[in-house]
């Protein structure tokens, strides 16, 4: 089971970092870090670290923040570009995939979220850190890739995992 954080929750928004408006990258990484490590790492933890390292401002996160946060919290990060097969394989192995979305279902501008699972029809479940409602549906992986935004640092899709085999509770199903 994936831990879900929403960037709009009041608990994160007295920090002064503008998480509600621009904290989707660090919030997405808080989902991955907390899920994979079993440690309670909140959006405030990831945003403050990214800010201190120069990866985050009130305008949002730099793309290189994703691999940097993974490394800081002891995780691995593989940039997948927009490679359909690599994204699918990562999800099949229980590895969450952080995605940077462009205009479409999820945003009008740019928005980070997490792909958490894929079914036999190649529909993905998402942890959209900006919308609990959008997190309740499945989306065609093809559509998600087609709505991604051009990104640097190996993006717009990044596989996040532990050294060795990623193990989430999905592996025991």
Please tell me what each predicted stretch does.
Residues 76-133:
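Active-site-adjacent substructure of cysteine-protease-like catalytic cores
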Residues 118-173:
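Noncatalytic regulatory segments and standalone regulatory/sensor domains
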Residues 48-82:
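Mid-length scaffold segments of soluble, non-membrane domains
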Residues 21, 25-33, 43-47, 63-70, ...:
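Extracytoplasmic/secreted envelope proteins and their assembly/folding machinery
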Residues 3, 96-98, 112-114, 156-162:
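Ordered hydrophobic segments in well-structured contexts
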């Amino acid at each position: 089971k994936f831990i879900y954080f929403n960037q709009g929750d009041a608990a994160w928004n007295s920090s002064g970092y503008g998480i509600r408006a621009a904290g989707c990258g660090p919030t997405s990484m808080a989902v991955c870090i907390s899920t994979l490590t079993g440690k309670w790492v909140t959006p405030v933890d990831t945003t403050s670290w990214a800010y201190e390292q120069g990866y985050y401002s009130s305008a949002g996160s730099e793309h290189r923040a994703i691999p940097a946060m993974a490394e800081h919290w002891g995780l691995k990060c593989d940039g997948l570009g927009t490679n359909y097969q690599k994204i699918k394989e990562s999800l099949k192995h229980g590895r969450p995939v952080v995605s940077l979305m462009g205009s479409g279902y999820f945003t009008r501008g740019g928005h980070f979220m997490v792909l958490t699972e894929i079914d036999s029809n190649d529909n993905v479940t998402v942890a959209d850190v900006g919308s609990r409602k959008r997190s309740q549906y499945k989306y065609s992986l093809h559509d998600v890739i087609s709505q991604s935004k051009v990104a640097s640092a190996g993006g717009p899709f990044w596989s996040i995992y532990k050294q060795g085999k990623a193990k989430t509770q999905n592996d025991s199903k």
